[in-house]
Design a protein with these regions (language model features):
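Short, charged amphipathic alpha-helical segments flanked by flexible coils
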Residues: 2-35
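ATP-dependent helicase/translocase motor core
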Residues: 69-296
Length: 296
């Protein structure tokens, strides 16, 4: 049943509450909703956002097809439309008529489709959501949202080193593409460096969904904290053997799932003790939580 408050927010939240929509997919729908509102009410436009959200919308459509349509459908790579500078005359009346015909046909197909038990549908929805491929842009979008929810300022497109964002007193920043002297991975750029004020407290490495995340911790996750540049030494709050950052994280943006143990969740390693092992977290540490751990 539709919620009493029949807004987009309420509908999305109802689907999550009833187990028909994962948190990640809900985050994407909320992102689409917000950027749409921004475009309509603030005249906002961004080619980068448009391309990223178009890819995510395509991924949502594939999930919908595999959940409510053809369960045998297999993923097909999205092809970005070429830029078209031609002005095309559109017959609006014909377009609306065609849309109405397609909607009617879809309703008839739905009415004649085999009935699927609710629990079976939920199982399929979650299975498809957890197995679907994610683009790097989607992974970054999800991580940004997750970090913001626990109190970090995160925005991969705007809060990044190349846009002159630097550690600042009074701010809790997740600065994207932060340079180090490392020679491994992304040319020495950490996906995010976490700063509480002017204190460098963590490094985050974001990876593709098929990667084994604990191995990322042992590779880039350890190398970046070793290779902090001389000009960034002023942000270092201590040294633990060869490490100049206390905490390191790796993730692919996927929520922790026991059946995909090493390929899901947020993996964390406290570098302050050499015998510590990587462990899976169910959510990001907040700045306050990190400060409490540092003080322990």
């Amino acid at each position: 049943a539709l919620p009493q408050d029949n807004t987009a927010v309420a509908r999305i939240d109802t689907l999550v509450r009833e187990g028909l929509l994962t948190r990640d997919l809900a985050t994407i729908l909320h992102g689409l909703r917000k950027v749409r509102n921004k475009a309509v009410h603030e005249n906002y436009s961004s080619v980068t956002d448009s391309k990223n959200f178009l890819l995510m919308a395509y991924g949502m459509c594939e999930w919908f097809m595999q959940t409510y349509g053809d369960w045998s459908y297999t993923h097909k790579d999205f092809v970005m439309p070429e830029e078209n500078v031609m002005i095309v005359s559109v017959d609006k009346e014909a377009e609306e008529k065609k849309e109405a015909e397609l909607a009617k046909q879809a309703e008839e197909n739905a009415a004649n489709a085999p009935k699927v038990a609710r629990d079976e549908r939920k199982k399929q929805a979650n299975k498809v959501a957890n197995q679907r491929p994610k683009t790097e842009a989607e992974t970054r979008f999800l991580i940004d949202e997750q970090l913001r929810m626990v109190g970090w300022e995160a925005d991969t497109e705007n809060i990044r080193y190349s846009k002159d964002v630097r550690p600042t007193k009074g701010r809790k920043l997740a600065i994207a593409e932060y340079p180090t002297n490392s020679t491994v991975g992304n040319r020495g750029y950490a996906d995010y460096a976490l700063f509480i004020g002017e204190k460098l407290v963590g490094i985050i490495e974001a990876k593709a969904i098929h990667k084994d995340i604990p191995s990322v911790i042992d590779y880039q996750g350890k190398d970046y904290p070793r290779c902090i540049r001389e000009e960034d030494e002023k942000y270092v709050i201590g040294k633990w053997g060869e490490f100049k950052v206390p905490f390191t994280f790796a993730t692919n943006g996927r929520p922790y799932l026991e059946q995909y143990r090493t390929k899901s969740g947020i993996w964390f390693l406290d570098l302050r003790k050499p015998d510590n092992s990587p462990m899976a977290l169910h959510g990001w540490m907040s700045p306050d939580g990190m400060e409490e751990l540092l003080a322990a």
